[in-house]
Amino acid sequence: SFSSYLNLVRLGVPEDDISTILMADHGLMLYGNAVIVNTEFAKANPDMVKKFLIAVGAGWKDAIANPEAAAIALVKRNPAADAALEQRRLQLAIDANVLTDYVKANGMGGIDTARFASAIKQLSETYDYKTTPDAALYFTDAYLPSGGISLN
């Protein structure tokens, strides 16, 4: 949604003429980005997985504290990117998807089990499951610090 919004702005559409309709604002309970780790790798390298998640959290914390520096770092890796545009995209993501009330209260990385169960149920309205998914097969907090990753 942020890319579409910013593309319209770049094309000269006045921002007051653009409405962004977020599915989450209308009851869709899905989670977004996730770190996916091969279960065998995680079992064999639990400390590495834990340290990686802590590093991801530190990166987010730095990006939240200084979105301009984060955008500049991105442009160093992708010279075709526009730093001002990427900073704006990052800020939109931080405001709407990263620093949520849940994350502020519970840290980053964990899930609300009731929400996750609702998300699985909502997906079943579109997809026919051969077996009912077991949420425990798709998420573990075993590699997260107690209380999640604090972004405060």
Predicted regions and their residues:
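Bilobed "Venus flytrap"/periplasmic-binding protein-like clamshell domains
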Residues: 1-10, 27-32, 117-118
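Short, catalytically relevant binding-site loops at active-site mouths
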Residues: 3-4, 25-28, 41-42, 59
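Ligand-binding "clamshell"
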Residues: 7-23, 84-88
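Short coil/loop linkers at secondary-structure junctions
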Residues: 14, 80, 129-130
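Short linear loop/turn motifs
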Residues: 21-23, 88-94, 134-146
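A bilobed periplasmic-binding-protein/Venus flytrap-type ligand-binding module shared by bacterial periplasmic
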Residues: 31-47
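Conserved C-terminal helix/tail region of periplasmic/extracytoplasmic solute-binding proteins
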Residues: 116-152
